[in-house]
Curated annotation (Swiss-Prot):
Subunit structure and binding partners: Homodimer. The tRNA molecule binds across the dimer.
Protein name in the entry: Serine--tRNA ligase
Native species: Desulforamulus reducens (strain ATCC BAA-1160 / DSM 100696 / MI-1) (Desulfotomaculum reducens)
One GO molecular-function entry: serine-tRNA ligase activity
Domain of life where this protein originates: Bacteria
Record PROSITE patterns: AA_TRNA_LIGASE_II
Alphabetical list of PANTHER family matching this protein: SERINE--TRNA LIGASE, SERYL-TRNA SYNTHETASE
Gene that encodes it: serS
Length: 424
């Protein structure tokens, strides 16, 4: 959420940022309501001053043994006016809050302006896509042929975009999770968190999923509870409504979780395989930093996610998202895209974003720069470190052999109990 004072003082700057995103949100209603609120606050303050004066006059009259009924009646009328005015102000503030919650973050000046993913800018590549001497299979065929993935029974038991991992498939998924957590905690300084997979509405509001993206969430019927779409939600909200000490920052957390997404807008996209599931596993990286350090932290976070792909030997590229492709809450985002032979293209496997104080303001997460200073909002960042199912897909496709077997990446062999090859 943007600072109300910033929007009030810089409407042209906010509108320019919205225009870069391709948003047609108008600030007219916001500015009108904000002006109305400030006018009513002045009137309310005047009425409260009047009430104080009348109250003092009543006290003097009673002390002197004189009739104070007229003044008492006057104070009741003033008190009612104050109540009515406070109610009006509260209603206006609710409308202002609703508008502020609907406004996306303002893109950082370093973000390329564009309409969509076609305007993203490639920053760098790592590794070279493998040249196969045979026709490579897609991961869904490989998984079913090896009896380690079962999409048909996933559909039977639950529905479309659900799957079973079996045998070596389940073991490889678990190996990836443990490897990622070990690398981030041992080499990158993250503290592991194992969060709840169900959160309340306030948590979803804090990280920006609500109210705008309610249709993409799985909500528990009749309850103010949601299945998490990413561990970003519970881990960021870990410090909701708290004031951190300056020496605590930066805070690095990593978390494994299952993720649940309705994917309401993804009909017809990536219908086969593990690329777009309603339930999938992910290791998430979350940071809380001082404002002046957040962009340096974004570069480090992105490098941390890249390290996973490098260790797995998977070719990938880093792209800087354009204003038209960025998420609602982000001020700047890098996507890591892994090479998938079945698509003959790079596919997203991680998004690393700096939200500035956008989430912290919604979730009320602050820090105190000095022991006696006024609390300020922290900056929050997160990124996938990385999406586990997509990593498994990339391993199956990039490490497949002509006989249909899969070579296990060397770094995962210890996590697989010494198994170096997955065969039928």
């Amino acid at each position: 959420m943007l600072d109300i004072k910033f929007v009030r003082s810089n409407p042209e700057l906010v509108l320019e940022g919205l225009k870069k995103r391709g948003s047609d949100i108008s600030l007219d209603e916001f500015l009108k309501l904000d002006s109305m609120r400030r006018e009513k606050l002045v009137v309310a303050e005047q009425l409260k001053n009047t009430r104080n004066v009348v109250s003092q006059e009543i006290g003097k009259l009673k002390k002197a043994g004189q009739d104070a009924e007229e003044k008492t009646l006057e104070m009741r009328k003033v008190s009612q006016k104050i109540k009515d005015m406070d109610d009006e102000i509260r209603n206006i503030e609710e409308k202002l809050q609703e508008i502020l919650l609907s406004i996306p973050n303002i893109p950082h000046e370093s973000v390329p302006v564009g309409k969509d993913e076609n305007d993203n800018v490639e920053i760098r590549r790592w590794g070279k896509p493998r040249g196969f001497e045979f026709e490579p299979k897609p991961h869904w065929d490989l998984g079913e042929d090896l009896n380690i993935l079962d999409f048909e029974r996933g559909g039977k038991v639950t529905g479309a975009r659900f799957s079973f991992y079996k045998g070596m498939g389940a073991r490889l998924e678990r190996a990836l999770i443990n490897f990622m957590l070990d690398l981030h905690t041992r080499e990158h300084g993250y503290t592991e968190i194992f969060p709840p997979f169900i959160v309340n509405g306030d948590s979803m509001l804090g990280t920006g999923q609500l109210p705008k993206f309610a249709e993409d969430m799985f909500k528990l019927e009749g309850l103010n509870y949601y299945l998490i779409p990413t561990a970003e939600v519970p881990v960021t909200n870990l410090y909701r409504d708290e004031i951190l000490a300056e020496e605590q920052l930066p805070i690095y957390h990593c978390a494994y979780s299952a993720c649940f997404r309705a994917e309401a807008g993804a009909a017809g996209r990536d219908t086969r395989g593990l690329i777009r599931q309603h339930q999938f596993n992910k290791v998430e990286l979350v940071k809380f930093s001082k404002p002046e350090e957040s962009f340096d932290e974004l570069e480090r976070l992105t490098a941390n996610a890249e390290k996973i792909l490098q260790a797995l030997g998977l070719p990938y590229r880093v792209v800087l998202l354009s204003t038209g492709d960025m998420g609602f809450t982000s001020a700047k985002t890098y996507d890591l895209e892994v090479w998938l032979p079945s698509y003959n293209a790079y596919k997203e496997i991680s998004s690393c974003s700096n939200f500035l104080d956008f989430q912290a303001r919604r979730a009320n997460i602050k820090y105190r720069p000095t022991p006696k200073s006024k609390p300020e909002f922290v900056h929050t960042l997160n990124g996938s470190g990385i999406a586990v199912g997509r990593a498994l897909s990339a391993i199956l496709e990039n490490y497949q052999e002509a006989d249909g077997s899969i070579t296990v990446p060397p770094v995962l062999v210890p996590y697989m109990g010494g198994i170096e090859r997955i065969t039928l």
